[in-house]
Amino acid sequence: MSLHLKPGQLTLADLRQAYLAPVRLSLDPSADAPIAASVACVENIIAEGRTAYGINTGFGLLASTRISPADLEKLQRSIVLSHAAGVGEALDDAMVRLVMLLKVNSLARGFSGIRRKVIDALIALINAEVYPHIPLKGSVGASGDLAPLAHMSLVLIGESRARHRGEWLPAAEALAVAGLEPLTLAAKEGLALLNGTQVSTAYALRGLFEAEDLFAAATVCGGLSVEAMLGSRAPFDARIHAARGQRGQIDVAAAYRDLLTASSEVARSHEKCDKVQDPYSLRCQPQVMGACLTQMRQAAEVLEIEANAVSDNPLVFAAEGDVISGGNFHAEPVAMAADNLALALAEIGSLSERRISLMMDMHMSQLPPFLVANGGVNSGFMIAQVTAAALASDNKALAHPASVDSLPTSANQEDHVSMAPNAGKRLWAMAENVRGILAVEWLGACQGLDFREGLKSSPKLEQARRLLRDKVPYYQEDRFFAPDIEAASQLLASGCLNALLPARLLPSL
């Protein structure tokens, strides 16, 4: 993928593509003047002997310590070395690439006082697929993502290591792959690299992208379950949802109508049945999934803004010659967006688990107990439903909001923090849980449909059915179940059901 970056204009679709695959990045020339002006402003402050935080002072609680001109370069190198204190497993290439893209986008806005040379070095690393070692843990999301961004920056100054096409290389070798040599950071540049919400935002963006894929899958699986359970189409009638007026609900109901078309032989087979109302997990899908969609859209809006934001501190306003300390590094918007995504993921999984449970109950589903013939000898989906219940319950605990947590840091100078990285990275575990739940529902709904006398569903639902059946056959009798769940989960992880939903329903698709 080639991406020509106009600073501050990244879209969610751009970010999704950059997360999914390597990118060839170029920077629009319009960035040159603002970048140069901000650097000149920093240089003028030093030349005039003015005091400005982060340029010629210490950091955090040490901000009142004035640094001599002779030590300014050492100051910037020292902040990178000392702040690289993260722990845990290394982020994968996709996450590091996303972090670096976000950092380039922020720095290139021209409010950070960092030279084009440094920004170009980050771009060169991205283009050469050289990804610095960044540990998963160590940021509280204020004052920015200091530790992980310090690890990202170590490679630029010839320290630490980076991964290139699966191989770890010492920093000097990694730089050489990208045609670079170690940099000497000028005044303000170390702080500009470290300060910002790019890691928190990348964590939450991954959560958003996975949540979107799972939302699409849950909508399709929910439609399949309606068919398998001989559910009514009446609850999806557009008039019901227009009367309420909730945009997300209206859009989701339309998506279900698109899946549950009148061409379905399954639907026609029970048009004259005497069932009045279906259980809520079937009937209220537009209401619940619509609320989830609204949460996801709101979170996506916040994250797209943050992806294009300047979250450095202090900020350089070159036109006025001012350097002003503020708090854009505080990732509270990201933390709250991630918390809202967590609520949506928990509900998507919870609703799916309830549909699975309905299909297991022969009194509710009018299907063989646990979706298998010769019950007793065969246990069918009995324990698969238990697995889904365990995963749904796990997500209830993980959905607890991270943004309400705060621990003071930096000797109480940084006395309120966002915990945005925690809010973001727990989304990955939640998404994995939801993927497992939906895998069981997909398997179960297709098994249920196979019992419906060979009747076909609508074209799109038949397409979803074929996708699964190409990998997992019908259950004639009990067999080793876990590999089937894994096969369905891998299909879901590919986003293979996204195309079955209307275009532009989800923010980044």
UniProtKB/Swiss-Prot annotation:
GO biological process: L-histidine catabolic process; L-histidine catabolic process to glutamate and formamide; L-histidine catabolic process to glutamate and formate
InterPro entries on file: Aromatic_Lyase, Fumarase/histidase_N, HutH, L-Aspartase-like, Phe/His_NH3-lyase_AS
Covalent cross-link 5-imidazolinone (Ala-Gly), where: A142-G144
Keyword Lyase annotated: yes
Chief place where the protein resides: cytoplasm
GO molecular-function terms, A-Z: histidine ammonia-lyase activity
EC number(s) from the headed UniProt entry: 4.3.1.3
Name of the protein in question: Histidine ammonia-lyase
Originating species: Pseudomonas aeruginosa (strain ATCC 15692 / DSM 22644 / CIP 104116 / JCM 14847 / LMG 12228 / 1C / PRS 101 / PAO1)
